[in-house]
Amino acid sequence: MIRFLRNNALYFAWLICSTGTVMSIYYSYLLNIEPCVLCYYQRICLFPLSIILGIATYREDNLVKIYALPLSITGMVIAVYQICLQEISGMTIDICGRVSCSTKLFVFGFITVPMASALAFCAISCLLILSGSKKK
């Protein structure tokens, strides 16, 4: 199982990233839900990863983690910060625009958008790290 995951880590990372990109566009343009500022920052990290990981998967380039891991970790840090804004009372942020960064919007009825984002970025990061290992 681990060998299968290691051999296909880039593909799974790209699949998670592409799913997140499609879901983000679906929420914005089809459901007309305006994202907050922190969501835009997470998108800045997520959208390029779809292209970068897609090319790396096609070329079987495991060295892509040098470029993709910083984007993934940055997105995860922003998502965790937004989770803290939502869950810790008294935490505020001054950069929020018309949409509050602390507003909870649930995906599938039980997980918030930043929590789904943090999980996706965490999974992408783990898969990128795993893709470079050469253990037999």
UniProtKB/Swiss-Prot annotation:
- InterPro entries this protein is in? DiS_bond_form_DsbB/BdbC, Disulphide_bond_form_BdbC, DsbB-like_sf
Which terms are listed as keywords in the entry?
Cell inner membrane, Cell membrane, Chaperone, Disulfide bond, Electron transport, Membrane, Oxidoreductase, Redox-active center, Transmembrane, Transmembrane helix, Transport
Q: Where in the cell is it found?
A: Cell inner membrane
Keyword Plastid appears in the UniProt entry: no
GO molecular function list: protein-disulfide reductase activity
Q: Can you cite an annotated GO cellular component?
A: plasma membrane
> What's the protein's topology in the membrane?
Multi-pass membrane protein
Instruction: Name the principal localization, coarsely classed.
Output: membrane
Judging by the UniProt lineage, the source's domain of life is Bacteria
Which positions form S-S bridges?
Answer: C36-C39, C96-C101
Name any Gene Ontology BP term. Answer: protein folding
Q: From the record, give the transmembrane residue ranges.
A: 7-26, 41-60, 67-84, 109-133
Please give the function described in this protein's UniProt entry: Required for disulfide bond formation in some proteins.
The family line of this record is: Belongs to the DsbB family. BdbC subfamily.
NCBIfam families, per database record: PRK00611.1
PANTHER family in the record: DISULFIDE FORMATION PROTEIN-RELATED, SPBETA PROPHAGE-DERIVED DISULFIDE BOND FORMATION PROTEIN B
Q: What is this protein called?
A: Probable disulfide formation protein
